[in-house]
Amino acid sequence: MRAAVAILGVMAIVLSVWMLEAGRMGLSITPFKVSDGPPATLYLAPGEDPAPVVVVTHGFAGSRQLMEPFSLALARAGYMVVSFDFMGHGRNPRPMTGDVTTIN
């Protein structure tokens, strides 16, 4: 009985990981950084003609990883998607400034 439960547990874990990665299959996902800019990710369906670009951003206390399901869905629909982290959020190493009335 324990062996059957263990096998079912392993199968459930494998299925969960497969389902998490299924959304990325067939897409080109390229992290990049432009000089001193924020870290970003480019999502593109390979073999597609040049497509309209969609910039996916996050709200306060968010990250590009949080917005990844939107980026994946748009890339699957044929758009070229660029997603990035604002200062002080996600993997952007630059801290958020205290003065929110000026832009550096």
Predicted regions and their residues:
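N-terminal cap/lid segment of alpha/beta-hydrolase-fold proteins
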Residues: 12-49
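Alpha/beta-hydrolase active-site loop
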Residues: 66, 99-104
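Conserved catalytic-core motifs of eukaryotic protein kinase domains, centered on the activation segment
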Residues: 66-67, 92-96
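N-terminal Sec-pathway targeting helices
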Residues: 1-10
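Short beta-strand element of the alpha/beta-hydrolase
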Residues: 50-59
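Conserved alpha/beta-hydrolase
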Residues: 75-94
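The serine-hydrolase catalytic nucleophile loop
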Residues: 60-73, 86
